Amino acid sequence: YTDFHYTFADKHYFQALLGFNQETRKTNSFSMYRDDLISSSFPTPELAVGEKGIGEDISEWAVRGMFFRVNYIYDDKYILEMNGRYDGTSRFPKKDRFGFFPSGSVAWVLSKEKFMENINQSIGLDMLKFRASYGALGNQNVGTYAYLPTMSSGQIGQILDGSQPVAVYAPGVVSNTLTWEKVRTINGGIDLALLNNRLSASFDYYVRYTEGMLTKSKTLPSVFGASEPKTNAADLKTKGWELSLRWRDQFMLADSPFNYSIKVALADSRAFITKYYNPNKR
């Protein structure tokens, strides 16, 4: 990534960041088991007489994206920030792999305004800041090959001609329209500090929308012979608030400064499913 920042006229601060990231992960795992050890002191398959099995798993996935951030601060009073990501993942079909996730925030430090000077002194106000933000994120919480019909293999449970042959199993049902689960959050908050920053408080209220949740879709009939795949099948709305209060101070104890801090936090939230296949809903 590259970063640029510049201060001009003593009161204007500007920063910009632009970057690129790519992550690739390859996994190759091997496992073996055999039941009925002759002695637990020697845990080796050679000293077991029961059923045995061998497993192997190979997978590969990648994520590629670009990101940016722009900050502008005027006189430490007015703060603006914008962010964005454009990400793609191999976990989704080619036509649905990429998504853009923007975010932004604004803040106003009211306590730094000139008309607040007398008020700050009279009540011991050190900082009062109002802020608001909007943010979007993407979730790719599905299997590496969830959109592809893959066949698995393994030894069957029956013995034929003195051994357990290997079988190849038919693929299950897949969704060919998988894409990013999008989470959008709108937040508003207040930060407060008093008494030489010994007492501080913070309050946030937020509404979060989760769209295209990656979950199982409508239940398929049992005669279909396969379980339902994960799709972008549901939407969720969450509303909540968070409040924190903190007191920190110090005093002399045995000729040494003793620092302490007390913090109280309260929070509440409620979530509602706003979209999901439910034929029994009235």
Which residue stretches match the model-derived regions?
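Extracellular/periplasmic, surface-exposed regions of secreted and cell-surface proteins
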Residues: Y1-R282
